[in-house]
Amino acid sequence: MMMPKKVKFRKQQRGRMTGKAWRGSSISFGEFGLKAMECAWITSRQIEAARVAMTRSIKRGGKVWIRLFPDKPITKKPAETRMGKGKGAPEEWVAVIRPGKILFEMEGVDRPTALAAMRLAAHKLSIRTKFVGREDSE
């Protein structure tokens, strides 16, 4: 699973997810992409599940780029613990996603194959997404 090798601070505040993505909103590497249409936290487990679904779908053809990285720690207190006694231990890592962000890119396969693979990946994520081609995003 994806997570940072080293972080300056182990715990972060949760923050807010407002506005649109202004970086990473166009296709840079591949021919086709999967674009987020709403705000969400996507966990490292979801990213890995989507990656596996996509790569198995295209078999050995094509190349896949993952354009998101889970760099935000989410903490959780143990079950049946009383309030107080500090912030919980880091439980999982998430990527903060805003609308317009390209999540995955792909090249080396034809459009119908890429669409089918991206659709499988989209079902593994907890947000609405849209399939885009390089000519669509510019």
From Swiss-Prot:
| Statement: the UniProt record of this protein carries the keyword Signal | no
| CDD domains assigned | Ribosomal_L16_L10e
Q: Which InterPro entries match?
A: Ribosomal_uL16, Ribosomal_uL16_bact-type, Ribosomal_uL16_CS, Ribosomal_uL16_dom, Ribosomal_uL16_sf
Q: What are the UniProt keywords, alphabetically?
A: Ribonucleoprotein, Ribosomal protein, RNA-binding, rRNA-binding, tRNA-binding
Pfam families xrefs: Ribosomal_L16
A single GO BP term for this record reads:
translation
- What Gene3D superfamilies does the record tag this protein with? Ribosomal protein L10e/L16
**Listed GO MF terms:** rRNA binding; structural constituent of ribosome; tRNA binding
Q: Which residues form the signal peptide?
A: none
Q: Does the keyword Translocase apply?
A: no
Lineage, top-rank taxon, reads Bacteria
- One GO cellular component term: cytosolic large ribosomal subunit
Q: Which SUPFAM superfamilies match?
A: Ribosomal protein L16p/L10e
Looking at the UniProt entry, the stretches that span the membrane are: none
Q: What does this protein do?
A: Binds 23S rRNA and is also seen to make contacts with the A and possibly P site tRNAs.
Q: Which NCBIfam families match?
A: rplP_bact
* Homology family: Belongs to the universal ribosomal protein uL16 family.
Per UniProt, subunit arrangement is: Part of the 50S ribosomal subunit.
Query: What is this protein identified as?
Result: Large ribosomal subunit protein uL16
- The source organism is Solibacter usitatus (strain Ellin6076)
